[in-house]
């Protein structure tokens, strides 16, 4: 009889210690799926306009990123709360751990929710497997129809520090505004011998407003050039190339453009050579 009582007490203690999970528990205590990626692909960088507002689950966005496991991810049209959820899903569901830096250009309740008196942050973000330093967040003097800007961080790619930029230029028929934005961005990029410039430039390769960028850097796709002879796969659902991985002082090894059901912009990633 004492043995039975002791066993019962031990069982109750175990239940009390393990429990059923308190409200607010996240996935961090759950086993990762058997097919979890668990590690990033070194020297792979990605850019993706998330599409906002779009009715897309952040778990699906995270799964798309995890499928290619880039070392550095730049996202545009991003709400800070969504990026945080994406980062959590990447770690808890896919075993990929990222640092995150934000480049907020505005606070917009319609785009990012929040409270009327404290709307959510909207803009760009960079996720990096390696730590990031020296973050800057710059709003262009003229955003056009909506505030726009660029952010930049320093992180390690190929074993060396590299400046990484993430930007989103003005949309539609605002060529003059984009030209001014390109001038601001190019002046900063020119300060670095090695730089990766990612983003949605809202301009096709031969658009005059991109001339300053082409003078400083090359596309990760060697066939893509700012001339009629260039061959540049589209990166949007409307069959235009608006998204770029510009490289300065870094050679590309491979690149891919990947349509996705979760945005009107395709995923674009590049594998980089020695930095």
Show where each model-derived region lies.
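Metal-dependent phosphoester-hydrolase catalytic domains
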Residues: 1-3, 14-35, 187-195, 203-275
């Amino acid at each position: 009889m004492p043995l039975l009582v002791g066993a019962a007490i031990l069982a109750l203690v175990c239940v009390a210690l393990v429990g059923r999970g308190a409200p607010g528990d996240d996935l961090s205590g759950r086993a990762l799926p058997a097919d979890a990626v668990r590690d990033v692909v070194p020297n792979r960088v990605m850019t993706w306009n998330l599409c906002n507002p779009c009715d897309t689950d952040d778990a699906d966005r995270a799964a798309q990123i995890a499928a290619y496991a880039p070392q550095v991810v730049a996202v545009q049209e991003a709400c800070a709360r969504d990026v945080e959820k994406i980062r959590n899903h990447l770690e808890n569901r896919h075993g990929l751990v990222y640092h995150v830096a934000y480049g907020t250009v505005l606070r917009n309740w319609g785009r990012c929710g929040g409270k009327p008196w404290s709307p959510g942050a909207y803009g760009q973000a960079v996720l990096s497997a390696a730590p990031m330093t020296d973050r800057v967040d710059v709003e262009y003097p003229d955003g056009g129809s909506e505030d726009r800007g660029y952010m930049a961080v320093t992180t390690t790619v190929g074993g060396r520090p590299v400046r990484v930029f993430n930007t989103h230029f003005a949309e539609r028929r605002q060529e003059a505004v984009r030209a001014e934005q390109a001038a601001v961005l190019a002046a900063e990029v020119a300060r670095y011998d090695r730089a990766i410039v990612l983003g949605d430039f809202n301009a096709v390769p031969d658009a005059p407003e991109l001339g300053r960028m082409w003078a400083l850097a090359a596309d990760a796709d060697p066939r893509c050039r700012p001339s009629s002879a260039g061959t540049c796969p589209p990166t949007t659902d409307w069959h235009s190339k608006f998204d770029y991985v510009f490289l300065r002082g870094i050679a590309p090894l491979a690149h891919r453009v990947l349509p996705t059901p979760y945005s009107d912009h395709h995923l674009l990633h590049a594998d980089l050579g020695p930095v």
